[in-house]
Amino acid sequence: MDVRDRIRGGLTRVLVPTGGIEQNGPFVSLSKHNYIARAVSLRAAELLGSTLVAPVVPFVPQGNIKPPTGHMLFSGTISLKEKTFEALLEDIGASLAVHGFTEIVFLGDSAGNQRGMQKAAAQINKRFHQSPTRAFYIPEFYNYPELRKFLAQRGIEEHPEDFHEELAFSLQLLAISPPTLRYEQRIAAGHTTLGGLSLLDRDKLVALGKEIIEMRAQSSVKAIRERELMPERK
């Protein structure tokens, strides 16, 4: 009933974050992208105002299932077919539209999510073309070059670990929830550096993670505002 009342009160914009379940080496949570997608989306909603955030879509394309490719070569990964992912997003968007949301925004924290979100938004716009509903896909939410630039401006050069761990994402996790990075276990095991930075300077790393989350949220909000000004459906 809370959602119903908010919609009746004029709140008709909803963010739909997508994440993923994938291998990330011995320390990082399989749900890395889900934690980050939720945190950045919640901050973006705060900046936008009058915006709700739907539950994170946790399952996304991660490679062929059989024979396995991509992240599916590693245990713990869960993958969807591209057409399954697109259909899932379209049904989620349609459900939100039927209940009164007129602005449905897809945001994805992984490279494999992008095409499916773009196609789903297009299908929703086609399906609801006679209504006020519009769906948007925001690629600016996942802008890895921008993250690298952010680090470089602070004199930090990204050195990805051999087992698919990237500093920009680990910094966000440290700011969101240290256990998802197994922070204490790392220190106890003698792994006290990450991407050339000392994990012992925790406060500094948390501050960097919060800056990244804020930067991504602001970039996403800017992109959403720009899409809202477009007369055509994209």
Regions found by a protein language model. Give the residues of each.
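Extended, histidine- and acidic-residue-enriched regions that form the cofactor-binding/catalytic faces
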Residues: 1-105, 109-234
